[in-house]
Amino acid sequence: KPRPQQFIGLM
């Protein structure tokens, strides 16, 4: 499950 913090890293 991708965490919200990982999403920020993608951006």
Curated annotation (Swiss-Prot):
Report the InterPro entries cross-referenced here. Answer: Tachy_Neuro_lke_CS (IPR013055)
Q: Where in the cell is it found?
A: Secreted
Q: Which UniProt keywords apply?
A: Amidation, Neuropeptide, Neurotransmitter, Secreted
| Keyword presence, Secreted | yes
Residues spanning the signal sequence = none
Please report which protein family the annotation says this sequence is part of: Belongs to the tachykinin family.
Could you identify this protein by its name? Substance P
